[in-house]
Amino acid sequence: VKRAEILEATRVCVCGEREQDYGTPENNFATIGYFWGVYLNAAHPEYTKAFPYNGITAKDVAAMMALLKVARIATGSSADSFVDLAGYAACAGEIVTAENGGTA
């Protein structure tokens, strides 16, 4: 698979079907971060000060999902994992740009 094909598959996925299914990355990742925080506080109360329930941001979720993909790539990769990795990076970049008032 060529770079351009991976990036095109990422664009189709991230800018089309994923957003239609799950909403914007900012909103979806913020919800995931909230639930992860609630879970971590319930499962590991000793971490409450370090990770308050609202302390995992949409940007954090994008970064951690990218790390999940890197871990999968390390143990056996398929082109799909690289498509997903590029998608999480693109979403993180968009989230950071929005947080910075539209500048990267």
Tell me the role of every PLM-derived stretch.
Residues V1-A104:
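Intrinsically disordered, low-complexity regulatory regions
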